[in-house]
Regions:
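Feature marks proteins synthesized as precursors that undergo proteolytic processing into two chains
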Residues: 1-198
Length: 198
């Protein structure tokens, strides 16, 4: 791919971009890659704060994250040798008899673990196929109570909650499912993504 660097840095082009639509606040990327030999990579990367650490590796143009920002001078996240900061970056791979059944990942910050459980529950307990499990309305427990996407019948709920339109901003998931030896890939309708077979 030839990148038109001169055009992208042209002051007239940049002036035309000012005041236009702004991108979202997403800084997390998840991808799953599988080959015909059964190898699978389920990977997640997040800058954390906007522009991450503000350090970009010059040769490849990779901006480094600042996940260490959650360290503190005392308490459970105290800086110490061989310690990792609190964060929610995680992916999920489900195996059965040594064979991959599912690989799943999602953006969504502190909601990520809840989303993993919700989608896995949709598949295992409710018998949904992977596409329906990812697309299903979500409910997530947040600092301000429950966040519930349209599609649930909400009656008699005594805890504080907020209904949001479907599809909501509850994270963007991608999934690979191995069904009878056929790999199914799917990318969530809640954001930009793609499922490609090559």
């Amino acid at each position: 791919v030839k990148i038109p660097v001169d055009r992208l840095l042209d002051p007239e082009f940049l002036k035309g971009r000012l005041g236009g639509p702004r991108g979202g606040g997403g800084d997390t990327t998840y991808f799953v890659v599988a080959d015909s030999e059964g190898n699978v990579v389920s990977a997640i990367q997040s800058l954390y704060y906007h522009f991450g650490s503000l350090v970009t590796e010059p040769k490849y143009g990779i901006t480094l994250n600042n996940r260490a920002a959650d360290f503190s001078m005392s308490g459970v996240n105290e800086v110490a040798p061989r310690k990792r900061p609190l964060h929610t970056l995680s992916t999920m791979m489900v195996m059965r008899n040594g064979e991959l059944e599912l690989a799943l990942g999602t953006s969504g910050a502190h909601y990520r673990p809840q989303q993993h459980v919700l989608m896995l529950t949709n598949i295992v307990d409710y018998g949904m196929n992977p596409v329906n499990a990812v697309n299903a309305p979500r409910f997530l427990w947040g600092i301000d109570g429950l966040i519930i996407e349209e599609g649930f019948e909400v009656t008699g709920l005594s805890v504080r909650h907020r209904l949001i339109k479907y599809p909501g901003s509850t994270g963007v998931a991608s999934i690979l499912a191995n069904i009878n030896g056929v790999k199914i890939l799917y990318s969530d309708v809640r954001g930009d993504g793609a499922a490609l077979g090559l």
